[in-house]
Amino acid sequence: MTKVLEVIYGFGYGGIRAFIMNYLNFLDKDKFKVDIYVFGYESSPFTDKVKELGANIFFEPENNAAKKPWLFVKQLEKFMKGHGPYDVVHANTNLISAWVLLAAKRANVPVRLAHSHSASHFGESWKQNLYSYLRRFMIDRLATKKLACGQLAGETMYGKNAKFEIIANGISLDRFMYRNEKRIEELKHKFNIPNGAKIYANVTRMDPQKNHLFAIEVFREIHKIDPKAIFLYGGVTPKISPTVEVVKAKIAEYGLTDYCRYTGPVMDVEQLYHMTDLWIYCSAYEGLPFGPIELQAASIPVIASDVITDEIDLGLGLVHFLSLNDNPKKWAELAVCIQKKQIPSDIIIKAFQKYNFDIRQGVKKLEAIYEGN
């Protein structure tokens, strides 16, 4: 049996956690035993689910990767030697992967995988750029294989001429295509949604990256056109994040409190998708986000910022791109014109298979990589 260690910062409601859980659901349990090492947090709402899927999850509350990388490497190496031996270490930690892979090398792990999940730029000052270069150099030397969620994410982390393999953010279509009318009505009641109101949403991690303030500017313009419209926002909040209070203050400043709903984390986000009419996905940067992919499986339209890779568009006519340089009024005018429509399930399935976003396709590729192929 191949023993795999997944390394990740936090295990909340974000996309990297979703990636691990999605693949964990479909990995061959007779061939692979998975442990998950979570640093920077001491718990997760998904602990029980991880255990149900036959995996173990371990927490290191300290996050020494940024300021004390030598201590981080020492702690992780000790863990690997104490809980291994591991055949595979899969670093889902962007540039922090340099330190994860160093620990894996010192622990004699034969298959060492770096995985880019983001297309963010990793530094602005010359010191930050130099530090990023050092970690990229280490990853290049220490990784036995480099992975990425998409072309843009791979080029951003490894370089345009680097060799890497794409592991798509595959999803289970059955989960997102299924519409549960009873649960949708429960959610409408929970969030006090008036009958007939058109629902717009940006329920993503409360982080500046997700650009909630711009989404509020867009909804402000939508409200001028459609005074009955409702806006949902929220999602998981990092330990230290002023974003929630800043967004709530802006909503109050614009007099929109009665028309905006803070959801907090939502476990069955697929039914929240089905409840809504359109999503405003105005991130400042992304790798290849799960949200727009999942929304297309649910047949929900999306307006996305053009900094997001066009790899998210599966050709179903549901994704519309606008620039963050366009004024919010332009976003709002497009939003109110887009009508929700149900795409036939067979067409959705074909599109997901064509672009390799069906989890059953991706898991075969990942299993081969875990086996050293």
Across the structure, where does each feature detected by a protein language model lie?
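Short hydrophobic beta-strand element within catalytic cores of glycosyltransferases
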Residues: 38, 301-306, 311
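Nucleotide-activated donor-binding/catalytic signature segment of Leloir-type glycosyltransferases, i.e.
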Residues: 244-264
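Aromatic "clamp/platform" in nucleotide-sugar-dependent glycosyltransferases that forms part
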Residues: 265, 284
